[in-house]
Regions:
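Trp/Phe/Arg-rich N-terminal binding region typifying the photolyase-homology
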Residues: 1-58, 174-175, 179-248
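A charged, amphipathic alpha-helical module
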Residues: 40, 44, 48-168, 172-182, ...
Length: 248
């Protein structure tokens, strides 16, 4: 349960639609080794729940096949991160985090369109990087967007870039789980998947202690050579709302 919105959605489905529900508990203190066994057992419980509801048996071969595709997609994503750390970033604005956020939740290594898109986009990206082409007419500032973004206003970064020369080279919700999933051993695969879910959207930086969002911001600024931070005032996330004073 990463946030109030998730809790409310699950409660609504459970109460009003009378749907079978499994409450998948993801550890908050995800950097601690002591919680990892619990995290894996939660995943095993989720698998058992699905098997009971569907009458099907979990197909490890299909899972490993999908995770191989997912791992390749993750490698393409990491290429984007690396290029944006250079003097010639190629992926700025909302394109960076919106695609990352939704492909992470939608693909699961099952939809071939995502991997094909990654290949094509990264080919264009690497061509621009190798030719040292600027991604915008003017780059006055290298900026990091922090806190939870506003999905209902996705063109904010484009406006900042076009009007002010503020190039967003990294966004908090694009820098989510980069864990490569084991594709041979079921136990190791579940351990990797559990660690990945602990670092997903609205979790990696907003859970597990202030260091994951406050201290991590300065790490990201250094990695991306940023000279500006744009901070979303996300009042619907209690984690970020509670840390606002710490940032100030």
């Amino acid at each position: 349960m990463p946030c109030d919105g998730s809790v409310a959605t699950t409660a609504y489905q459970d109460r009003y639609f009378n749907l079978p529900t499994y409450y998948y508990g993801v550890p908050i203190r995800y950097n601690e080794d002591a919680v990892q066994n619990y995290a894996v057992e939660e995943l095993r419980g989720l698998i058992r729940f699905i098997e009971e509801q569907t009458g099907e048996t979990f197909d490890w071969d299909a899972f490993f096949k999908a995770m191989k595709v997912y791992n390749r997609e993750t490698e393409y994503e990491l290429q984007k991160w690396e290029v944006n750390r250079t003097p010639y970033p190629q992926m700025t604005g909302e394109t960076f985090w919106i695609y990352r956020m939704f492909f992470y939740h939608l693909s699961g290594g099952m939809d071939p369109h995502f991997l094909d898109t990654d290949r094509r986009v990264n080919r264009i990206m690497m061509r621009g990087y190798q030719q040292k082409k600027p991604c915008a007419p003017a780059m006055r500032h290298r900026c990091v967007e922090w806190s939870c973004p506003a999905n209902f206003y996705p063109d904010f970064s484009v406006w900042a870039e076009n009007c002010w020369g503020i190039n967003v080279v990294a966004s908090m919700e694009s820098l989510i789980s980069d864990i490569i999933i084991n594709t041979e051993d079921p136990d190791r695969a579940l351990a990797d998947l559990a660690r990945s879910y602990q670092r997903t959207t609205m979790r990696k930086h907003t859970k597990g202690g202030y260091a994951n969002v406050l201290d991590e911001l300065w790490v990201v600024c250094k990695q991306y050579n940023a000279d500006m931070v744009l901070m979303y005032d996300q009042i619907s996330c209690k984690g970020m709302d509670g840390l606002r004073g710490v940032f100030e």
